C-alpha cells in the first residue's frame, strides 16, 4: 500500500496542534503554545496566520520533517456557511469567507488558511474536514415555535462523524448504511441523529439547546430566561456567559471539572450526586428524543468525548437508554487523527473531495 504523508493543523486561541501522519500512523504530534503577548499584537485573529505558519514550519524542521515529502495538508474547518459533511478542498471562496469571518471570528478559521498557505507552495492539495457548521438537518427539524427563529446545526461534527465511522467499521458496515445516535460529551454536549451518513437532527450545543454540560446551560425555562434578561440586573454579555461558559456545572456547583464533581459524588455529597444525575438524565432524555427522529430504528447508541471516560456518568445514561439499542462507548476525541483520516479518504479515492461554492448567498456542496 502506498504511503500518503499528511500534515494536519488544528489552531486554538493560544496554541496550534500539528500532526504528521503516514496514512493512519502518527509520525509527529505536537502542541505549539504561543506567547500570549506575541499573538496579542495582532488586531485580528486572521492576521496571525503568517506568524503561525512560520512557527509550524520551524517546528517541522526541528523534528527533521521534510515538507517536500508531504502529499496533502489538512486544517481544522472554521466558521463557514452551513455545508454538508465531508472533506473539502480549500478554494478561493472558502478563503474569502474564512478571512472575512462570514459566520464569526475564531481561531479555527486559521486552519484552512494555514493549510492552503503551506500546501500551495508545495503544489499539493489543502483540505478541511467536517467543520462545526456542518448542516444536514431535514426541513422538519429546522422549525421552531417562533416565526423567523430557525433551529441551527452547530455541533461536534468532526468527532461525531469520525467516531461514527469507527463504530460502523467495528460493526462491519459502512457509515452510510447505519442509523446511529452519537453523543459527544465534553465542555458542551451534542446528540446527533445520524441517518445513513447524514446528521438529520442535532441539538445546538453552542448556545442553549439540549442537555446542560460542564460549561453550558442547555435548554432552560424560556419564560424565566426572558424575565432575567429584562430584570435590569444583567448586561447582554453577562447573560450570554450564563448560557455559555458559566452555565451547567459551573453555575450549579462552581466547577467545570467533571473529575472533581465525580470525587464529590464518590464521597457521598448529596448536591453533587443530584446534579451529576441530572446531567446524565438530560443526556438520556435527549438521546430518547433523537431515537424518535429515526423512528426507533437504531443500530447503536454511541457515547464519546472526554466525559465518556466517566463510568458514573456513562452507567447512569446506559441505565436509561440501553433498551433503545446497544450502547458503544468511545471515550475521548482525537481531532488530529480525524482530520488526517478525512484527507486520507480523498487521497485513496474512497470518496471525492467536495467543493465549497457560494451562489446567491447560499453555499452548495458538490461532490
Curated annotation (Swiss-Prot):
One of its GO terms (molecular function) is ATP binding. It comes from the Bacteria. GO terms for cellular component: cytoplasm. CDD domains: ASKHA_NBD_BK. Signal peptide: none annotated. It holds the Pfam family Acetate_kinase. This is Probable butyrate kinase. The gene is buk.
Amino acid at each position: 500500500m502506498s504511503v500518503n504523508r499528511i500534515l494536519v493543523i488544528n489552531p486554538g486561541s493560544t496554541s496550534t496542534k500539528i500532526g504528521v501522519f503516514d496514512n493512519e500512523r502518527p509520525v509527529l504530534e505536537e502542541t505549539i503554545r504561543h506567547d500570549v503577548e506575541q499573538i496579542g499584537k495582532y488586531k485580528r485573529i486572521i492576521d496571525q496566520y503568517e506568524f503561525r505558519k512560520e512557527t509550524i514550519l520551524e517546528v517541522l524542521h526541528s523534528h527533521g520533517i521534510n515538507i517536500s515529502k508531504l502529499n496533502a495538508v489538512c486544517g481544522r474547518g472554521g466558521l463557514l456557511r452551513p455545508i454538508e459533511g465531508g472533506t473539502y478542498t480549500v478554494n478561493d471562496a472558502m478563503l474569502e469567507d474564512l478571512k472575512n469571518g462570514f459566520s464569526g471570528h475564531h481561531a479555527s478559521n486559521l486552519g484552512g488558511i494555514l493549510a492552503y498557505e503551506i500546501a500551495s507552495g508545495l503544489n499539493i492539495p489543502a483540505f478541511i474536514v467536517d467543520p462545526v457548521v456542518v448542516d444536514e438537518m431535514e426541513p422538519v427539524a429546522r422549525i421552531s415555535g417562533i416565526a423567523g427563529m430557525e433551529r441551527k446545526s452547530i455541533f461536534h461534527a468532526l468527532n461525531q462523524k469520525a467516531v461514527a465511522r469507527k463504530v460502523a467499521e467495528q460493526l462491519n458496515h459502512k457509515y452510510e448504511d447505519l442509523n446511529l445516535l452519537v453523543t459527544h460529551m465534553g465542555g458542551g454536549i451534542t446528540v446527533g441523529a445520524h441517518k445513513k451518513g447524514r446528521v438529520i437532527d442535532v441539538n445546538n450545543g453552542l448556545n442553549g439547546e439540549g442537555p446542560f454540560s460542564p460549561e453550558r446551560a442547555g435548554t432552560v425555562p424560556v419564560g424565566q430566561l426572558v424575565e432575567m434578561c429584562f430584570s435590569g440586573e444583567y448586561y447582554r454579555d453577562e447573560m450570554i456567559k450564563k448560557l455559555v461558559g458559566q452555565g451547567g456545572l459551573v453555575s450549579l456547583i462552581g466547577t467545570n471539572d467533571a473529575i472533581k464533581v465525580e470525587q464529590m459524588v464518590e464521597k457521598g455529597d448529596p448536591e453533587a450526586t443530584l446534579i451529576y444525575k441530572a446531567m446524565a438524565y438530560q443526556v438520556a432524555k435527549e438521546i430518547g428524543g433523537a431515537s424518535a427522529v429515526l423512528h426507533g430504528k437504531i443500530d447503536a447508541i454511541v457515547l464519546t468525548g472526554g466525559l465518556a471516560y466517566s463510568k458514573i456518568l456513562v452507567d447512569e445514561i446506559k441505565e436509561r437508554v440501553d433498551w433503545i439499542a446497544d450502547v458503544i462507548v468511545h471515550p475521548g476525541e482525537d481531532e488530529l487523527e480525524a482530520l488526517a483520516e478525512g484527507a486520507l479518504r480523498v487521497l485513496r479515492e474512497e470518496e471525492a473531495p467536495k467543493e465549497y461554492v457560494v451562489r446567491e448567498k447560499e453555499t452548495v456542496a458538490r461532490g
